[in-house]
Every structure is written in structure tokens, then in C-alpha cells.
């Protein structure tokens, strides 16, 4: 049983969804029905139970329009309401198919959806809609078994006002037009967990960026996006070489408006990305490598429960860094690993400070907990470090061969960590390496809170140069011998590591305002375009009490809604100027995605 779902796939399993919906921007609603096909897997099952949250259910029919009885459970404050649909007596045997149409509409409180007015878009001409279903928000888009333990095919027929375009995480199969509306049809023939269902409706334009890829965005941003993501096909090709053939057909990218709360979301066929990646020099394209890696890790081999999220994210980070290493030199793998360890350390410290250390276990107990509340770098970086440790025991070539075999074996399935562990042991026992892998303390890796129990040593000369500049030139020597040329030859990742090292190493004893002013006069960090630099520089300045940065922080906070940036920055601003932090959030919270707004409110104690 999935503790994050109220549904019953272990008794009656949904196999496909067919969505027929109209997009109503005046009411901020999707209206229509979903046809749910399911199969009985437990003899005598009387009900199909679906997850819903903030949906209005009108009625249920069978395919011949006969009414079917249903009821909604009491509302659970995290997981919503169960929609309990009666299965006719003749269809309660194992293997029988039960098809029901659920007529419904979404509401303004459906937190999978963000409705933007035309003024909140880049073009200012048309409204915009986008979804974000991970982790447990698909149930506020469509009644479904909203658990990664169950995978479904889906089709859709979406009616939108002209001249807008609809896209989904599915193959576009057609468009028909009438006087004032267009109908777009889609099909997704590969079964996917419901958190990968996605929709966007807006004034969208596309450019071809590869043999199987386009980038989509509002017209004013499409040229910048075309340039920024030009290496997409290279990433896919390396992923295929490392793992298995890419099975999804297309790989398109959608550049979203600034309020999108994540860096990227791996919706199949249509990765969603934040405009904060538009650095102008392709320096932040690693996020695209990450989302491409999800085409295998997460989208094909899926964590069965959200507590085992590292099976999605730890594997994806590992493959992402393998891709970047193969393209840009093997040192890149170690460099990114060292950077990731810093982020992991910060999150472990944060959860420990909040007395939630149990959420730093690789497999935390999420009973009754919204997975969003447990979101951190732990499944990403601690999961990645587990794989690096396993690789160190068996060797790179053999581990990569196992990884390819693992993807082949578990594709199209949802699995638990013990299946991964058992297959690792079985595979390397057959290869004669049982002695090398006998040292793995799986129980502690999976269940012990805190930093990884074994530390792989990562080596990167480029990282050492960046760290030395931070620790010796600036922290030890206070910038006395610093020059403009210090970072002239630095790659983007080195500047990020330099700033991260400063933040991390001065947490107890901040740099003085005079030192930061000198640093800014040499390196010009206050006026950078790159969002990763800006976020770190502003964090550093707030921590040191550089008052003049506060208006710049507010400017950045209201210009985008990526949680990676807004949550820590609001927390830092709240420490030094709580009145400004709270008034800024209260004034602009309606511009943020509902997930981001909820999390920032918690961070600020509102």
C-alpha cells in the first residue's frame, strides 16, 4: 500500500485514462470528463477507488451512459478525498475490465494547475496554464490512482480558445479548429505514473533544435531558448550509449514562465524548464542533461513509493554526471560530485536544525507526510553517493554494465530499493565479485539519517583552484592579494563552487562588509545575469549584513518563483529583515506557484 495515496490499485488497477476537457480561462477551470479503464486484480472487489483533491465531481456513467453509484470520502488534509465508485456485480472477478466516465471540473484550489493572467506572461497578450503534478498533485488535475506504484496509458482531447496552443506529456496526434476554439488530441502509449501527466496551454511557438527535438516557449523567448538548449541531442545520444535506446520518440523542451517552481520537470516527450536557465552562454544546460537522464531513471524505472525517491533522483544525478563527464571531460563528474556534497551537507544541517533529522535518511518514513514537505537534496545527492560507493567497489566498467542491465531489467516497472539491492548482489555474485560487495551495509545506507556512511573521495584540480581562492585568498587573507583576473578563466561551475565555499565556510564567522565590497568591485557579482551566481552572491551578502543588497534580493525574489532560489533567499532575508521578507512575500505570493507559495509561507512561519 502506498501511504501517499487513498486509491486501491492492489484490488482494481487503472490501466488507462482518456481525458476530454475544455480549458476555461474565465473561471480558471478544466471542465469535462475522464474515461477510466481498470482491471480487477482481487476477486470480489466491489469498488474502484481513485484519488481526488479540490475537484468537483458531477456524476459517473458507464460507457452506455447508465449512471454508476459513487461517493466521496471525508477529506484528508494532505491526501484529499477518495472517490469510491461501485463496480457492477458482474464485473467483480479477477481479469474483468471496468470502464467508468467521471464527469468533473477542477477548481481554483486545484494545486496541480497554475493559471496566469496575460499580464503575468512575457507577451502580455494571452493567458497561460501549466501543470505540475509531482509528487501527489495529479489528483487535483484528474481523478486517478495517484501513486507511482501504478502506471497508465493516456489519451486526451483538449479544447482551448483560439489562438492558443495545447501541449501535453504525450504525442500530439491532431488539431481541429472551429470559429473560436481549437481541439488538440494526444496519446501516450507507454504506461507512466500519473505524476508525469502534464498540460500547458498558451501562446506558444517552437523551433527545431535536433532530429527529435523542438523547444517551445512564448514567442519573445523562443530564440534565446533555441540557443541555450542546442546541445540537447548530444545529451540524448550519450544517454543511449550509457543505458538503452531512447524509447519515447520525441524529446521536446518547454520553457515556462518565471513562476515555474522547479529547475526542470521530466514530463515525457516534453520536459518543462525554468527561464532561470537562460544564462546566455549554455552554462546551465546541466539541468537538461538531468531531465534527459530521467527518460530512463524515473520515467522507465520508477520508485514504487515516494519514500524511495532516490531510485528516481539518485540514479538520475549519477547518469546526468556521467553524461556531462563523457562530453566535457571525466573531471566534470568529480567536480559536480564535490559541489553536490556541499548541498547535501547544507540540507542535512537544515533538517537537523528543524528537528527533522529522520528526513535525511535515504528511505525516510513518509506516512501521513506530504512528499513536498520532505523535498531536499538528500535523495539526489545521498542516492548519488551510494551509487558512487558501489561503483568504487566493483570498478567503473563493470558498474556501468550493471547500470545498463538494471535499466533493461526494470524498465516499465515501479520498484522498491530491495529489488535494486538484490539485483546488484545477484549480478555481481555471478560476476565473481561477492567478496568485494560483501562490505556494503545496506541497512545503514538506506535507513541511517545524516551524511553518507561511506565517503568516496572525489578529485578535481579545477575544484581545488576554486576552493583555494575562497578559503585562502578571501577567507584567510581577506582579499588583500585578489585581482580581477582571479576568476577570468573560471568555468561556470568553478564560480558556483567558489561562492558555495564562501557561504559554507563563513556560516559561523561571516565575511566583513568591506571584504564583500572589495570582492564586488573586482568580480562584479551584484549585476550578474546568471541566476546561480546571483542567488549565491545575494545569500552571501545577506549573511554578512550588506544592507544595499536587500533591494536586489527583493527584485530577484519577485522576478521568478524557482523554489531552489526563493525558499533559501526568503529564509536568509527573514533572518536580517523579517519585516521586508514577510511584506514582500505577502505582496507577491499570488505570483508564485501554489506549491512554492505554501512552502515559503511555512519557511517564514506564516
Swiss-Prot record:
Residues holding a peptide: 132-134, 261-266
Main location: cytoplasm
PROSITE patterns linked to this entry: ZINC_PROTEASE
Binding of Zn(2+), residues: 290, 294, 313
Keywords tagged on the record: Cytoplasm, Hydrolase, Leukotriene biosynthesis, Metal-binding, Metalloprotease, Protease, Zinc
Localization, UniProt: Cytoplasm
Residues of the active site: 291 (proton acceptor), 380 (proton donor)
Broad class of enzyme this protein falls into: hydrolase
Alphabetical list of SMART domains matching this protein: Leuk-A4-hydro_C
UniProt cross-references to InterPro entries, sorted A to Z: Aminopeptidase_N-like_N (IPR045357), Aminopeptidase_N-like_N_sf (IPR042097), ARM-type_fold (IPR016024), LTA4H_cat (IPR049980), M1_LTA-4_hydro/amino_C_sf (IPR038502), M1_LTA4H (IPR034015), Peptidase_M1 (IPR001930), Peptidase_M1_C (IPR015211)
EC number: 3.4.11.-, 3.3.2.10
Reaction(s) this enzyme catalyzes, per UniProt: an epoxide + H2O = an ethanediol
Homology family: Belongs to the peptidase M1 family.
Function per UniProt: Aminopeptidase that preferentially cleaves di- and tripeptides. Also has low epoxide hydrolase activity (in vitro). Can hydrolyze the epoxide leukotriene LTA(4) but it forms preferentially 5,6-dihydroxy-7,9,11,14-eicosatetraenoic acid rather than the cytokine leukotriene B(4) as the product compared to the homologous mammalian enzyme (in vitro).
Annotated protein name in UniProt: Leucine aminopeptidase
Native species: Dictyostelium discoideum (Social amoeba)
